[in-house]
Amino acid sequence: MDKVMRMSSEKGVVIFTKSSCCLCYAVQILFRDLRVQPTIHEIDNDPDCREIEKALVRLGCANAVPAVFVSGKLVGSTNDVMSLHLSGSLVPLIKPYQSFHN
């Protein structure tokens, strides 16, 4: 779990993904459309993939990926992110990390 916490706090917006996950891709596109360039960790390319998945679930992700962290805090998985976006709560959360240049 230490590795996940360290990785999740390296940058403002961090997303743990798997290269074959279509929901991971959708979440990445949402953040890019909102002018945020998240740090992406494709865990299937990490030798500690299993341990990372277990740690993400222990932290509260319903599914291990995608797992979105903002300011080092777990936002959640796809449903959590989409719910925040639809309620208008996501943009204020990520505002410090938005770029006005795309």
UniProtKB/Swiss-Prot annotation:
**What's the family?**
Belongs to the glutaredoxin family. CC-type subfamily.
Chief subcellular site? cytoplasm
Q: Gene name?
A: GRXC14
Organism in which the protein naturally occurs? Arabidopsis thaliana
- Is-annotated flag, keyword Oxidoreductase? no
Domain of life where this protein originates: Eukaryota
Disulphide bonds annotated for this chain are 21-24
Domain Glutaredoxin positions? 1-101
Q: Where are the transmembrane segments?
A: none
Instruction: Respond yes or no to whether keyword Cytoplasm is given for this record.
Output: yes
Q: What is this protein called?
A: Glutaredoxin-C14
Q: What InterPro entries does the annotation carry? A: GlrX-like_pln_2 (IPR011905), Glutaredoxin (IPR002109), Glutaredoxin_subgr (IPR014025), Thioredoxin-like_sf (IPR036249)
Described by its record, this protein's role is as follows: Has a glutathione-disulfide oxidoreductase activity in the presence of NADPH and glutathione reductase. Reduces low molecular weight disulfides and proteins.
As for subcellular location, the record says: Cytoplasm
In terms of NCBIfam families, this protein maps to:
GlrX-like_plant (TIGR02189)
User: Which GO cellular component does the record give, naming just one?
Assistant: cytoplasm
Question: What Pfam families is this protein classified in?
Answer: Glutaredoxin (PF00462)
Q: Which UniProt keywords apply?
A: Cytoplasm, Disulfide bond, Electron transport, Redox-active center, Transport
